[in-house]
């Protein structure tokens, strides 16, 4: 099982896409071998190029830290992969399932502008309907029931792996977000309870603590701050 890194949510999004890049390498390697065994030269060559592409993306995110560029290219490559193979093998080959899987992953995009993930989601949806309306019959001789069943099973497994991975990382991301909020809340409470100049409890904190005390078993002692005059003269 994948273990979430102990970092903030942005680091976790980067972690998600590093794993997704590795998944892309494995997936396209399987397709390249399968297409080679079935003697389909064009899709075999395409998937070999895709393996090299994902290796390049892995280097881009690990060495150059260009996560936004890598994520954009990965989503565009997915659309290109699905479109090419749907045109070659027909709609019934079910390559469109990858569009469904990737559309659910766009909300882990490392972009500063919040609308960009929705743009990629719309591109996946648009590609889905355009392929459905315009592509039915395959270009390659792939209309045999056995071959279509093999492609359907492989594509279904690949798409469900992506969807299950999204479900897992969504849960882990929610945990990270919750931990970050708790830490932020603790920091804010600490800032609210202490005077920023003296480092001592401020009036509101003292009033809150006094209200929590049992009046019959509590004592209040008041003292002066030795360097209060220095603080007052320095900061006003």
Annotate the PLM regions.
Residues 24-35, 54, 60-61, 72-97, ...:
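Hydrophobic transmembrane alpha-helices
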Residues 186-208, 223-236:
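Conserved nucleotide-binding and Mg2+-coordinating catalytic segments in signaling enzymes
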Residues 1-70, 169:
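N-terminal juxtamembrane segment and adjoining first transmembrane helix
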Residues 157-185:
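Juxtamembrane or sensor-core-proximal signal-transducing alpha helices
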Residues 48-53, 95-102, 154-158:
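Membrane-embedded alpha-helical segments of multi-pass membrane proteins
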Residues 206-216:
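Alpha-helix C-terminal capping segments
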Residues 219:
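Cell-envelope/extracellular polymer assembly enzymes that use nucleotide-activated donors
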């Amino acid at each position: 099982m994948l273990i979430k890194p102990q970092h903030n949510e942005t680091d976790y999004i980067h972690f998600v896409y590093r794993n997704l890049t590795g998944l892309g390498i494995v997936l396209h390697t399987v397709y390249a071998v399968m297409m080679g065994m079935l003697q389909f030269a064009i899709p075999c060559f395409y998937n070999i190029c895709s393996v090299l592409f994902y290796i390049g993306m892995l280097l881009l995110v690990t060495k150059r830290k260009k996560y936004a560029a890598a994520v954009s290219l990965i989503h565009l490559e997915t659309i290109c992969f699905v479109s090419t193979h749907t045109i070659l093998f027909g709609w019934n080959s079910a390559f469109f399932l990858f569009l469904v899987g990737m559309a659910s992953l766009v909300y882990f995009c490392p972009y500063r502008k919040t609308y960009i993930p929705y743009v990629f989601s719309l591109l996946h949806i648009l590609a889905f309907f355009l392929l459905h309306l315009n592509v039915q019959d395959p270009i390659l001789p792939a209309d045999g029931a056995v071959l279509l069943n093999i492609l359907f099973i492989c594509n279904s497994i690949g798409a469900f792996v992506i969807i299950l991975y999204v479900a897992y990382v969504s849960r882990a991301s929610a945990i990270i977000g919750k931990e970050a909020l708790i830490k932020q809340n603790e920091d804010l409470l600490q800032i609210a309870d202490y005077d920023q100049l003296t480092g001592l409890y401020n009036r509101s904190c003292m009033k809150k603590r006094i209200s929590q005390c049992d009046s019959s078993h509590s004592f209040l002692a008041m003292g002066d701050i030795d360097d209060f005059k220095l603080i007052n003269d320095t900061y006003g």
